[in-house]
């Protein structure tokens, strides 16, 4: 037994001598010696200087590294585990030499750049405090250190991880670790001396570090990137005493932590989107409008598009108020079903308005959309008024046809705005909507006066004729898009109004003896009003014709055409009424 113990002790002495010789060689070249791992109870401070080019190092001062290791003396397994590190010391020295040469080239390159920018000296100090674990000196890759050390607590892996973190932040080993001994030589020459303290942190300190990183958003250029090591629990933290210096330090030392800032911004945007979803739960209609508003802001980003969004929402709210009024006035179930159809029509109109704003994105087109919304409101008011006056089922069916016609007109208006996108076409669209409103007023009056089924069929044919005329108007605007054609379209719409007024007047002058007393009273009461409105419309039509820049012959042709068409309609109407009265 004694011989075995002596043999083991002799082997240990031989290994210690070899490690001491290799440590001296590594120390002369500027490396961390591996023989210090045999003394876990010591507290060592080593200074190593690496000089590759004397011209740069003498002018700037040799950069040195100061490491302070606090090692526990209670670890009894370090002597046995240090033998495993000593066996791999030969491989470590070759890799550390390559690593030192690369880092020293970076130091020389940065010093050349600072000769022109920063003539004064800058020294930095790294103090590494380590409590517990093994003491091992050697710059080895962390993945290889995991394979060699099962405990994963080697100082070499910790030092390499610290070095990786410093390189990510734009620092090389020598730039981030200037010696504190050079501090006394410069006597005021160091303007920015940073102290970077690396130590093993607890969970509470990690949480505090995360909060500090969020607070330092304004000074994000000085935030050090925090990453977990492969085989250690080290984390980089700024010293509290020098934190105010780091906030106003140079920009080339600590770079921006882009990943953390982007993550925080994404969280902020997610919170805003969640708030938008909460608003959408409160009001479904407003949430749909706000979602389309977000798409417009992301796609176009123009100020004019965003200004026109609340106009559309205000028009939709006004439509809802009009619906409430019309439903209070009407009590017939068949008319309530017609209101349901109107609601579907207007919802389709609002969705198409959003599509127009997304596709076009121009200010003129949006103004035309707001005008169209106002015309739809006026149409609904008119429908509510004459539904209270009319109680005949056949006329209710005719109202359904009118609703289909108006919806077709609105869809064609959407196509014109999407394809054309010109200001002149939008003005003609708003005029067309006004003409449709006037036509509906005239239809409402004529239906109150007339109760004959044959005349109801005639109204149906007139409606088909007007819808066909509007479709041809759409084709002309899409093909030509000129200003003169649009003025002619407005003239044709006014001429249709005039024809219907003449027709209504002839019906009032030749009443049917078979009509009810209720319809007769309405005819007498409304005859004066319809005549007055007829005169107003005719005077308005004449004024619009005088304002046009066309020739006088063109106006004369239009008037003659309308007079001839009025006479023809009067003859047809008299022929239809004579066999019924006899």
From Swiss-Prot:
Participates in the formation of a gel matrix (sperm coagulum) entrapping the accessory gland secretions and ejaculated spermatozoa. The gene is SEMG2. Belongs to the semenogelin family. Keywords: Repeat, Secreted, Signal. This is Semenogelin-2. Residues 1-23 form the signal peptide. It is found in: Secreted. Residues 137-157, 174-192, 325-335, 427-437, 445-455, 487-498, 506-529, 547-557 have a biased composition (Polar residues). InterPro entries: Semenogelin. Residues 25-65, 91-157, 171-192, 272-366, 393-557 are annotated as: Disordered. Residues 50-59, 293-310, 336-345, 353-366, 396-405, 413-426, 456-465, 530-546 have a biased composition (Basic and acidic residues). Residues 111-134 have a biased composition (Basic residues). It comes from Colobus guereza (Mantled guereza). The lineage of its organism: Eukaryota, Metazoa, Chordata, Craniata, Vertebrata. GO terms for cellular component: extracellular exosome. Interacts with SERPINA5. The keyword Calcium does not apply. PANTHER family: SEMENOGELIN-2, SEMENOGELIN/SEMINAL VESICLE SECRETORY PROTEIN. Disulfide bonds: none annotated. Its main location: secreted. GO terms for biological process: coagulation; negative regulation of flagellated sperm motility; sperm capacitation.
